């Protein structure tokens, strides 16, 4: 039996003046090895993307993390704090793709930037600099550490709702590599996990949606070695129609 297709919108990457559509391979590997689905990369030029056609063939969509941020013009009147870290081509594809996928009840999983896109697409807002907000911690990547330490477990999350039910734990440890975070939660989303400072780090879509999960951390990192990450990707794969037994 053919594996169900999971669409993965790319990021823009400029190399020697040429624009490339790129995705870190660990996302594609997680879709293939943990969710048991076939990853299919989606280019970012909106002129090349027929959202209806993508959703006609995709049984699920993974919205990945990225070095870039969602342009604040999509959720506030604020100027971007880091204008050099925007990816307008990605915004132009992912935000309408999320809204249409929700309407068509296509399973979605959203990670880091993708998690923030999910919130913005559905009417929520973001902190552009979490570490500058009173009472919130610094969740940014610690680049002075080794790669293994940077991507390893850093702080606990308190779980609730469906996420707690799936994982069977009240608390988990997660990595932390993000500068932005949810400020106002979109009305259609439900909070599922909280950091020690109260920041919402996981959300779920409406109950009637087959699978709509967003997480602020990076479960794709060494996914097959992490039982919690495997649970999330297997749930996603099963919702997309994969045989995850």
Regions found by a protein language model. Give the residues of each.
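N-terminal beta1-alpha1 cap of cysteine-dependent amidohydrolase-like domains
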Residues: 1-109, 120-127, 131-166, 173, ...
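The feature captures the ABC ATPase H-loop/switch
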Residues: 115
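Active-site-proximal beta-strand elements of phosphoester/diester hydrolases
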Residues: 213-216
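Conserved G/P- and acidic residue-centered "switch" motifs that form tight phosphate/ATP-binding loops
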Residues: 112
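A short, structured beta-strand/loop element
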Residues: 209-211
């Amino acid at each position: 039996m053919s594996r169900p297709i999971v669409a993965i919108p790319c990021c823009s990457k400029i190399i020697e003046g040429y624009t490339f559509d790129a995705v870190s391979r660990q996302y594609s590997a997680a879709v293939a090895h943990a969710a048991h689905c076939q990853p299919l990369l989606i280019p970012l030029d909106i002129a090349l993307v027929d959202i209806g056609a993508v959703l006609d063939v995709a049984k699920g969509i993974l919205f990945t993390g990225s070095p870039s941020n969602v342009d604040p013009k999509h959720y506030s009147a604020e100027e971007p704090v880091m204008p050099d870290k925007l990816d307008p081509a990605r915004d132009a594809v992912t935000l309408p793709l999320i809204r249409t996928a929700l309407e068509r009840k296509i399973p979605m999983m959203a990670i880091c930037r993708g998690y923030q896109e999910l919130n913005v697409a559905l009417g929520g807002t973001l902190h552009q600099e979490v570490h500058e907000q009173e009472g919130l911690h610094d969740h940014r990547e610690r680049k002075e550490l080794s790669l293994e330490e940077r991507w390893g477990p850093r702080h606990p999350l308190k779980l609730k709702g469906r996420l707690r039910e799936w994982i069977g734990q009240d608390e988990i440890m997660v990595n932390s590599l993000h500068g932005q975070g949810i400020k106002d939660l979109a009305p259609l989303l439900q909070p599922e996990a909280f950091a020690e400072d109260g920041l919402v780090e996981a959300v779920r879509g409406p109950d009637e949606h087959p699978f709509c999960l967003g997480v602020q951390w990076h479960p794709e990192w060494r996914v097959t070695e992490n039982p919690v990450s495997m649970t999330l990707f297997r749930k996603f794969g099963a919702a997309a129609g994969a045989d995850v037994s």
